[in-house]
């Protein structure tokens, strides 16, 4: 905390310690804060800052800026993963100094690093290590990172074709999101991550009906929360499932067109290329 910012602001407004503290705390409390660094209660500090027409966060300028930069970088990594731009995600991950992360940021970093490694088919032992750090003391870790760790481990086992173990972890993740309350756009993304990859697993083992149930749930969540970034991948997997289930060709084509539209909206070039290949196969009647 940079107390000098507080003192400078008080002096800029021409307030004495007595005038500023009036109705909030004793002048002695304010003096101990300004002269000796004895921080008062958050309630008192908030009221003092309000009287100075400033936010408490302004007393932590370097931390606030650093956190903001790191959070934006983590946001970008998460979006790269959704957009299937795994190499870009990996480069950003490499640029992060873990020593500068808060506890919440470190949890998020571990989940993102684990997913990037897994989706790029890197060493499974490393991926397990990242996810297991989140599970090692799950009583302290935010619930969303627990169900994301379960999903990541499910993906590892799916890639190994160890489907019984994969299903065990995907089911644990699904069970957790059933009781999870979505409170932010970030929460939407993480719940959709579970649903999408669990649906991918069930499609892989040819349980298309189960996969579709999860995907339709994802479509509903996107609609309720007005987000589109996962819709392209959800619609494309629905199209693939419909194709494998030998649904009406018109339905498959409509789903693939929807997927392409959302992929263009979200600038997902990787998925657009996959959709084009799929649509060419449909056109040839393969």
Regions found by a protein language model. Give the residues of each.
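A short, Lys/Arg-rich alpha-helix, primarily the initiator
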Residues: 1-12
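"A position-specific structural signal for the A-helix of alpha-solenoid helical repeats
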Residues: 71, 75, 105-116, 145, ...
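Helix-turn-helix repeat elements of alpha-solenoid scaffolds
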Residues: 80-94, 118-133, 163-176, 207-216, ...
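DNA major-groove recognition helix of helix-turn-helix/homeodomain DNA-binding modules
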Residues: 43-58
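Amphipathic alpha-helical segments of tetratricopeptide repeats
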Residues: 90-98, 132-139, 171-182, 216-227, ...
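Residue-level signature for tetratricopeptide repeat
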Residues: 79-80, 116-118, 156, 201, ...
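Structural motif corresponding to the intra-repeat A-B loop/turn of tetratricopeptide repeats
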Residues: 83, 120-121, 153, 160, ...
